[in-house]
């Protein structure tokens, strides 16, 4: 009977292991939707590229995109930034149509394939910019969330509009377009910050910090918070310091974390694994 008892225990443990791996697989198969938001001139596009490059170097399958897109509706929106903004309702409609195409053609297929999708702007920008023009922030938020997949995390890079306009003029050598006027930026920033207070998915970062500091913070947050929640065993039934899947090379999160640490400088490594 003792032998039978041990056999049953072994079977039970094997089933538990299979069950746990099934949970992990089903959770990670969706992919991760990561969004960067903020007013113009915050350095979002640079940070999107840096994060995408780092994750790709660690072996993750990454899709990098932006809104407005380069599709027909996105091109119309971009053209209006220089030629004169569309009427508020028409502009919102163009953003909705552009986003629907973006979701159908890229975002949803990428997530269903288990990829990390990183976006430079998403529907939060519509809530902030078009909400500021139309004055119906809550209605726009409801409209956008009715068809757009919820992101796993939103990195909001916050900066004073005066500083952002100086960056646009000095760094880009450009004259601010119709979306980059001080009044519009102030109103959008206020809405962004309000959204950050209400939505736990939004993590706010200080855009006044150096590019390297922001990059390091973003990588740490993504790997040790977002990715960990999606792929790590610790929240299920073990401890990192004594984790058998990690020690045996079966923990996706631990492997990615170590791979990133191996590819980064010593300063990044210290921040990443501390």
Predicted regions and their residues:
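Hydrophobic anchor at the beta1->P-loop junction of P-loop NTPases
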Residues: 36
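Hydrophobic positions on the alpha1 helix immediately C-terminal to the Walker A/P-loop
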Residues: 47
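P-loop (Walker A) phosphate-binding loop of NTP-binding proteins
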Residues: 39
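Conserved lysine of the Walker
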Residues: 44
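Low-acidity, Ser/Thr- and Arg-rich intrinsically disordered low-complexity segments
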Residues: 5-14, 19-21, 25-26, 259, ...
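NTP-dependent small-molecule kinase module
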Residues: 22-23, 52, 162-242, 253-264, ...
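A glycine- and Lys/Arg-enriched "phosphate-lid" helix/loop adjacent to the NTP-binding pocket
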Residues: 126-190
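ATP-dependent small-molecule kinase phosphotransfer cores
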Residues: 60-146
